[in-house]
Amino acid sequence: MHEMSIAISIIDAVAAKAEAEHADTVTIVELEVGKVAGVEVESLKFCFSAAAKNTVAEGAELAVCEVEPVGECEACGQRFPVAFHVATCTSCGSFKTNIVSGRELLIKSITIE
């Protein structure tokens, strides 16, 4: 379960930000997680809650915004929604595509007190 290592990394970043701001408590951590990032959101929330014990983030809400995957065609430049990891251009049918969105795992904001 790699979600625990991700949760610990998030807690480390959150704790560093809280320390830099001389804050005692973190109330909300907002994440952007791409739907093809390979992260199970419910597992991440569980792991975050466990990893936050006895830290400034204990009891903090982990708010997750899931980002839909978007592909871009190298042949025609068209952008299109991606249903799976294999993306075929919906405009020209080319297989020369890249996923340009949907793999994110970003801390978007931290609310501290």
Swiss-Prot record:
Residues that bind Ni(2+): H2
Signal sequence bounds: none
Positions bound to Zn(2+): C73, C76, C89, C92
This protein's UniProt keywords: Metal-binding, Nickel, Zinc
Keyword Oxidoreductase part of the UniProt annotation: no
GO MF, one example: zinc ion binding
Statement: the UniProt record of this protein carries the keyword Lipid metabolism: no
One Pfam family hit: HypA
PROSITE patterns: HYPA
InterPro entries associated with the record: Hydgase_Ni_incorp_HypA/HybF_CS (IPR020538), HypA/HybF (IPR000688)
Membrane-spanning intervals of the chain: none
GO BP of this protein: protein maturation; protein modification process
UniProt cross-references to NCBIfam families, sorted A to Z: hypA
Stated family: Belongs to the HypA/HybF family.
Function: Involved in the maturation of [NiFe] hydrogenases. Required for nickel insertion into the metal center of the hydrogenase.
Name of the featured protein: Hydrogenase maturation factor HypA
Organism name: Chlorobium phaeobacteroides (strain BS1)
Gene: hypA
